[in-house]
A protein has these predicted regions:
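Major-groove recognition helix of helix-turn-helix-like DNA-binding domains
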Residues: 73-91
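DNA-recognition alpha helix
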Residues: 55-73
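Short alpha-helical linear motifs
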Residues: 82-86, 107-110, 368-374
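A glycine- and small-aliphatic-rich helix-loop capping segment at beta-alpha/alpha-beta transitions
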Residues: 140
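Single, function-defining residue in the core of a domain
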Residues: 1-58, 91, 98-102, 117-121, ...
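A short, well-structured juxtamembrane/interface segment
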Residues: 105-113, 174-175
Length: 389
């Protein structure tokens, strides 16, 4: 059935066009549009992500090289640099943001697991900074001479899918964005030291959710009671009360303090949590799994285009980031639905070289043989989605 369909066209079958069209109607995205629709725009942007294009000009040149295939690839009649740049600059980014969230929901539903054996979902929250030229991206002012944006992400550690993302200028403190996090009752939220915002931690506590946050070294507290028999690696497991007046005002209840020594790194870590039911090794293990979000950021920057932007306006930057997230989720959905026993790096490499081929997807992934990433490049390539049901 797919013998005459291009690989990229086969990929788009995994996208819900009806839902995307609903969002286009909701925001009037195709108003006064004759040829280059929002759907054409989305596919062009995702083609650029999957084919590893470096710039808008690079993307348009690549599409122009396949002019005769444009219609069957889903781009419409043709794609010019002017039309794509104008679309990214003027069309409502909420269309692409909400579609990215829709794909996030689909990917998370398909990849649901129970790795931690806990009743609620387990999330890590962190941000990554992308530096920008202040003269060009004037709206992203960070300091007098620098520009940049932050991508704040709530990462589902079990499905390995970003559940929530918030884009801000780089000048915004990480802890200030905690108020934007959607809180689920019974879920677990893992934070690094930059998120010692006791007001927001107490909000999580009051909604019946749990948190584990790495404590700052200058934390002021007093022990209320502590455990004397401790598992290996656990130095302290105590119930504490905050003593600094402002902190105690923001978090008036007792907290749990766990000090853990990591033999692999020869480092000591101190955590705060409201999860008194967990064992102390479970608390430490939850934090140790926070590294997955750092791998996600590294993977996103290395293999999708969010470090070099194809437009200079805030709207264009947002559309590019949401297109990258759509591409990320598309790979996750394909891996699950096709039961691919490959890393995301392998899947992307295969796709980037084959988007305009007419090989059926099943044959494409079965016939292409890649050596182990580490053997090929001599370094540890972060891989995600490697395990699925």
């Amino acid at each position: 059935m797919n013998n005459s369909k291009y690989v990229f066209a086969q990929l788009t079958v995994f996208l819900d066009r009806n839902h995307f069209n609903y969002l286009v109607r909701k925001y009037g995205g195709n108003k006064y549009v004759k040829h280059f629709t929002c759907w054409n725009q989305l596919l062009a942007m995702m083609f650029g992500q999957l084919s590893n294009r470096e710039s808008l000009r690079d993307l348009v040149v690549a599409i122009e090289a396949h002019r005769s295939k444009c219609y069957h690839l889903g781009f419409g009649k043709n794609v010019s640099k002017t039309s794509l740049a104008r679309a990214n600059q003027t069309r409502d980014f909420h269309i692409f943001e909400e579609f990215a969230y829709y794909l996030v929901g689909e990917a998370r539903r398909k990849r649901a697991t129970d790795i931690f054996k806990l009743d609620g979902n387990v999330y890590a929250f962190d941000s990554t900074t992308v530096s920008l030229c202040l003269e060009v991206f004037w709206w992203a002012k960070f300091s007098k001479y620098k520009g940049g944006i932050k991508i704040h992400t709530l990462y589902d550690l079990e499905t390995q899918i970003p559940a929530f993302f918030h884009i801000s200028t780089a000048s915004v403190y990480d802890s200030k964005v905690m108020k934007e996090i959607p809180i689920e009752s019974g879920a677990y939220y893992i934070f690094d030291r930059g998120y010692n915002n006791f007001k927001e931690l107490y909000r999580i506590h009051c909604t019946g959710s749990f948190f584990v946050v790495r404590a700052k070294s200058n934390l002021q507290y007093k022990c209320i009671k502590w455990k004397r028999r401790l598992p290996d690696g656990i130095l302290t497991d105590a119930e504490i009360e905050l003593t600094f007046s402002d902190s105690r005002k923001r978090y008036p209840e007792h907290l749990r303090l766990v000090r853990f020594f990591d033999e692999e790194q020869s480092r000591e870590f101190m955590f705060l949590s409201n999860a008194f039911e967990l064992t102390s090794p479970q608390v430490a293990d939850l934090y140790k799994n926070r590294w997955q979000i750092e791998l996600f950021f590294k993977w996103l920057k290395q293999h999708l285009k969010i470090k070099r932007f194809w437009g200079t306006t805030e709207n264009a930057v947002r559309i590019q980031i949401y297109s990258a997230i759509c591409a990320y989720c598309l790979v996750a959905i394909i891996q699950h639905d096709m039961h691919l026993d490959r890393s995301t790096y392998e899947v992307l490499q295969i796709l980037s070289m084959s988007l305009t081929d007419t090989t059926p997807l099943k044959d494409l992934f079965n016939k292409t043989i890649f050596k182990n990433d580490k053997e090929r490049f001599g370094f540890n390539e972060p891989t995600l989605f490697d395990n699925f049901d």
